[in-house]
């Protein structure tokens, strides 16, 4: 049994390991966010130390991004679905696929260790110098976090190479690029973004490592360096990264909406592909909107403001194409479409607050307040996570050959929906009132909305626990699929449930 999983080269086994690893990390990240919300639930201290609070915030961000969203979306669903949707026997480099996965547990181990050694890495996920320099953060904590990022980055780069090669070279006969399912397209564009942005992060954190340990001064003004250089390098990675987190979600939502409306492709399929490509391209030329407060001149700010707003155009194309796909069709209201509808609505809300923050003059006031926290949590906690939840419920019968209790999953959707909105909507008010991020305490003027926000986080926690219970009961009761009534909107629904160890034993020909 151990060799089957340890040395596996089967894309389904590796995808399953990614999903389990992501779920485990997600619980870790969720418990950290609960600590954060309990600390902020009332004025005064609970944890009692700002450094530890910031260590928790930093670890929460890294775990949710690198060990929950990316492994589940790209590693889990990408590995499971891309070869099947292409009609390919497996990934292009199966053993490299195995290595991509096994780089992640040591990486997580290093990150957790960084919190346990000395006073931890309380730098925020951006790891800006001079706070992350050896003066403000002496000891090996930040170095361990840097090594952790190196490993996670290497894992993602290898995975990206694997996906690009697979998608370009291993499609079925008759499947042109244009005929590929949108989820495959989203993974391809995500992989290209990973391949182009992660080396820049690796360079930036390596320079930080040498600044801390080998007496260089890339980011130290006293030696002729500049901390703003680090910010440029970091955000040149950091902005494409947020699109890496959401693009596979776009693909999954497209598949879910098509399936539940009984269509084989969404409205404006080619437009959807071009929109994703445009989002990927534009994601690289807007990075400095994270840095409006560092003293860039007015022309630079004008450019980054307008470029950022242009990203709203392809995003709007996607939103309206989803609405057009839904419009007038006979919608099958199972739980996965509820997650998809929630995604479309809440992602739009998150996008609108993003348009607000794109204005450099407004951003100077709102920068580093809870308005920004509310914005990116609407996009991630209700974009990426809703995509993941919808995908789990949508493809669960295909992965395991078991049914989920449809009524309970609908209740779980409602609980989570109420929870996340109650958590993050009040944070817009806090941000507009001027409450800054990354502080463990606040004036009692902010008590009301913080209390409501923390209440919402408890409801979200109940929703996640309920999801675990639903999946657990489905597995122990072995609710087998006796009769397949799935819509053949995509190839994966034409296989067995679950698929055999080798999905296809011959080359396929796709006829449209």
UniProtKB/Swiss-Prot annotation:
* List of residues binding O2: 243
| Metabolic or biological pathway | Energy metabolism; oxidative phosphorylation
Task: Please list the cofactors this protein needs.
Answer: heme; Cu cation
Q: Which residues bind heme a3?
A: 375
Q: What is its main location?
A: mitochondrion
Catalyses which reaction? 4 Fe(II)-[cytochrome c] + O2 + 8 H(+)(in) = 4 Fe(III)-[cytochrome c] + 2 H2O + 4 H(+)(out)
Please list which residues make up the signal peptide.
none
EC numbers listed for it are 7.1.1.9
Q: Which residues bind Ca(2+)?
A: 39, 44
Residues the record lists as binding Fe(II)-heme a: 60, 377
Coiled coil regions, renumbered to chain: none
Enzyme class label: translocase
Q: State the name under which the record lists this protein.
A: Cytochrome c oxidase subunit 1
What organism is this sequence from? Answer: Rhipicephalus sanguineus
Name the encoding gene, please.
COI
């Amino acid at each position: 049994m151990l060799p089957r999983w340890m040395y596996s080269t089967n894309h389904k086994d590796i995808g399953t390991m990614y999903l389990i690893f992501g779920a485990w990390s997600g619980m870790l990240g969720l418990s950290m966010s609960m600590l954060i919300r309990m600390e902020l639930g009332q004025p005064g201290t609970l944890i009692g130390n700002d450094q530890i609070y910031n260590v928790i915030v930093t670890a929460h961000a890294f775990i949710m991004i690198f060990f929950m969203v990316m492994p589940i979306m790209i590693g889990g669903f990408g590995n499971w679905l891309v070869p099947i949707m292409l009609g390919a026997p497996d990934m292009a480099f199966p053993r490299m696929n195995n290595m991509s996965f096994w780089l992640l547990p040591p990486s997580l181990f290093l990150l957790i260790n960084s919190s346990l050694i000395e006073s931890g890495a309380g730098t925020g996920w951006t790891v800006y110098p001079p706070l992350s320099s050896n003066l403000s953060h002496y000891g090996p904590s930040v170095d361990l976090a840097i090594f952790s990022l190196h490993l996670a980055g290497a894992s993602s780069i290898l995975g990206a190479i694997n996906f690009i090669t697979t998608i370009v070279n291993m499609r079925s006969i008759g499947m042109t690029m244009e005929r590929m399912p949108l989820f495959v397209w989203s993974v391809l564009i995500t992989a290209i973004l990973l391949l182009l942005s992660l080396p820049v992060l690796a360079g930036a954190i390596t320079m930080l490592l040498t600044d801390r340990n080998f007496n260089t001064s890339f980011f130290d003004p006293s030696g002729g360096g500049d901390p703003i250089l680090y910010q440029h390098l970091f955000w040149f990675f950091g902005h494409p990264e947020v699109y890496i987190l959401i693009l596979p979600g776009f693909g999954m939502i497209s598949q879910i909406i098509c399936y539940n409306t009984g269509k084989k492709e969404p409205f404006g399929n080619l437009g959807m592909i071009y929109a994703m490509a445009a989002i990927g391209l534009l994601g690289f030329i807007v990075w400095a909107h994270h840095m409006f407060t560092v003293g860039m001149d007015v022309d630079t700010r004008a450019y980054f403001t307008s470029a950022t707003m242009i990203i709203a155009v392809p995003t709007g194309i996607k939103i309206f194409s989803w609405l057009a796909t839904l419009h007038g069709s006979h919608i099958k209201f199972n739980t996965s479409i509820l997650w998809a509808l929630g995604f479309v609505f809440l992602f739009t809300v998150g996008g609108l607050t993003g348009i607000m923050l794109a204005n450099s003059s407004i951003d100077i006031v709102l920068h580093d307040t809870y308005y920004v926290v509310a914005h990116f949590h609407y996009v991630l906690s209700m974009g990426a996570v809703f995509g993941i939840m919808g995908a789990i419920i949508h493809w669960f019968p295909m992965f395991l050959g078991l049914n989920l209790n449809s009524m309970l999953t609908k209740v779980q959707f409602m609980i989570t929906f109420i929870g996340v909105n109650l958590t993050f909507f009040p944070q817009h008010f806090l941000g507009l009132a001027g409450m800054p991020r990354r502080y463990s305490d606040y004036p009692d003027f902010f008590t009301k909305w913080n209390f409501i926000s923390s209440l919402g986080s408890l409801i979200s926690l109940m929703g996640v626990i309920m999801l675990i219970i639903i999946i657990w009961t489905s597995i122990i009761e072995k609710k087998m699929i006796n009769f397949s009534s799935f819509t053949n909107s995509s190839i994966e629904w034409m296989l067995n449930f679950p698929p055999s160890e080798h999905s296809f034993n011959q080359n396929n020909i796709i006829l449209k």
